[in-house]
Amino acid sequence: MTAIRYEFIKTCKQTGARLGRVHTPHGSFDTPTFMPVGTLATVKTMSPEELKAMDSGIILSNTYHLWLRPGHEIVREAGGLHKFMNWDRAILTDSGGFQVFSLSDFRRIEEEGVHFRNHLNGDKLFLSPEKAMEIQNALGSDIMMAFDECPPFPATFEYMKKSVERTSRWAERCLKAHERPQDQGLFGIVQGGEFEELRRQSAKDLVSMDFPGYAVGGLSVGEPKDIMNRVLEFTTPLLPDNKPRYLMGVGSPDSLIDGAIRGIDMFDCVLPTRIARNGTCMTSEGRLVVKNAKFARDFGPLDPNCDCYTCKNYSRAYIRHLMKCDETFGIRLTSYHNLHFLLNLMEQVRQAIREDRLGDFREEFFEQYGFNKPNAKNF
C-alpha cells in the first residue's frame, strides 16, 4: 500500500481540467488545490488553526531551511514535523534543490551532489539525493520531493540535456535511499526547460520509475506565461492519469486557473504571503495596494465580495494604518486575506469543473480581475 493515493473524480468537459482527491497518512484534500508555504515550519504570521479555518488541507515546508535551522534531527526528536508545528493535516516538503541553486552565490554541481555555501553564514555544505532523503525521512512529511537540478532560464539545449539526464539519475538514487515509502510518498520532478524533446525524455525516465506522484519543475523561473502554458500543454499528457500532478512555485490567480485547465492538481507559492507583507492584496476586482493614500479614509473591506475573517472585521483604512506603522497585525490581516482568496479561488475552480464550465469561469474571472486589459498588472 503506497502512502499517497490519487482518486480521480471527473474531467471538465469544457476544458479537460480534472477534479480529484489526494489521500495521505494525514487526511485527504480535494484537487486542484493551492498549498500555502510554511518555509520554516510556519506559514508566516499564521497559526495552524487559522489555516484550518480557511480549509487548507495541505501545506508545504522547506527541507533546506529546516536542515539549517533547527536541524532535521531536532525535528525527528520532536516526533516529526507534524508534531513539531502542531499541524495534523498533510505536509509536502520540497527537496532543497531550488534553494541550493537560487540562494547560494557559490555552488559546484558534481555527479554525487552539489557543493554550496550556507546563505546564512557562508559555511560550506553538500547536498546529495541521499542527504535530501535522509532529511525528509526525518521530517516525516506526507509527500517528499526527489532532489533535482534546477537549471536557470534561459538555458541551452545542451546544458538542459545534461541536467535532465543527471536529474533522472538522482531520482533513481532518491528512490533507493527513501527509507519510509509506506508512510511517505516520494514525487519525481520532470525537468527539461522549454524543450519538448527533453520534457518527453524526463517524463519517460521518471514514469518508468513508478513514483506515486509527479511534479513539473523548472517553470515560474522568469519565463513568459505563454511559454509556461505551452510547456504544460505538452508535459502533463506525458504523466499518468492515476497519479497527482504538481506545478511547483506557481501562485498568481491567472496561473492557477490556466494550470488547472492544463491538467495540474497541486500548486504552491510564497506569493500570497510575500506580497501581503508589503500591503498588496488579491481581491475579486484585481490587485489592491492597501498602503496607497487613497485608502486612508476608506472604511470598507479589502474585498467587498470576500467573507474571510479580515474582510468581515477590518477596514482598508485600519489595515493601511497598521501597515504604515509597521504593525505586525497588519501583515497578519493581509496574509490571512490573500491565503483565503487563493484557497477560495481553488474551490471556485473545483466547482466550475463539477459544472463543466471552467472555460467560462476563466473568462469571467480574467475580465473582472483585469487580466484581459492590455497592460494588466500582475504580481
From Swiss-Prot:
Keywords: Glycosyltransferase, Metal-binding, Queuosine biosynthesis, Transferase, tRNA processing, Zinc. GO terms for molecular function: metal ion binding; tRNA-guanosine(34) queuine transglycosylase activity. HAMAP family: Q_tRNA_Tgt (MF_00168). The active site is at D94, D268. Homodimer. Within each dimer, one monomer is responsible for RNA recognition and catalysis, while the other monomer binds to the replacement base PreQ1. Residues 249-255, 273-277 are annotated as: RNA binding. It catalyses: 7-aminomethyl-7-carbaguanine + guanosine(34) in tRNA = 7-aminomethyl-7-carbaguanosine(34) in tRNA + guanine. It comes from Bacillus cereus (strain Q1). Zn(2+) binds at C306, C308, C311, H337. Binds 1 zinc ion per subunit. Its EC number is 2.4.2.29. This is Queuine tRNA-ribosyltransferase. Its cofactor is Zn(2+). InterPro entries: ArchSynthase1/Queuine_TRR, TGT, TGT-like_sf, tRNA_ribo_trans-like. It comes from the Bacteria. Coiled coil: none annotated. One of its GO terms (cellular component) is cytosol. Belongs to the queuine tRNA-ribosyltransferase family. One of its GO terms (biological process) is queuosine biosynthetic process.
